[in-house]
Swiss-Prot record:
GO terms assigned for molecular function: structural constituent of ribosome
Family of this protein: Belongs to the universal ribosomal protein uL16 family.
Protein's name according to its UniProt entry: Large ribosomal subunit protein uL16
A single Gene Ontology CC term: ribonucleoprotein complex
Amino acid sequence: MGRRPGRCYRYLSKKAYPKSRFNRGVPDSKIQIFDLGRRKAGVLEFPLLVNCISNERENLSAEALEAARICANKYMVKHAGKDNFHLRIRVYPFHVLRINKMLSCAGADRLQTGMRGSFGKPYGRAARVVFNQPILSIRTKESFRDAAVEALRRAKNKFPGHQKIQVSSKFGFTNMFSDEFNKLNESGRIILRGGSFSVIREKGSIDKFKRDLEYAANN
């Protein structure tokens, strides 16, 4: 039996149905890798952020997410190099899809009960997305802006519905806008911690505030 078309499971018609002790025998997700490229790059190395954002409420199957991941990664490796970007899948397929298998042979009505007891058995997984929710994100250098936009444009063709490509005003994968981050970094108020960072706030003891400023200046 072939795989049922994705259009059968596209819309969010009911509440989520995750794996639990009541929902056993769920197949493994087709997507297992959610971060690709140079994952351990520092915050300052990749200041540009490009997002693929959903314009609909819908289900995205794990197979579609895996296809989009492969497509975007392949394009970025070819046009930017494997060490010049960090690709991240922003959703996870928690929702379990069900199927009520029906026979289509002669005399099928004698062998099955039709729509009686039609709850179905676990069949696959999908991620539930809503309006303006990021699906994929790429942080990279400013010189590879066009490559990142094109990679996500190709990846969104693997999804149903409508998506848009957004060049974000955030600084990389941080939660701060680029202007604010650069201003704090120039004033020595940012402590870099590899792929993350801390902001030195004007609170707490004066001694700790001075120590943090000195640590940020030396690093």
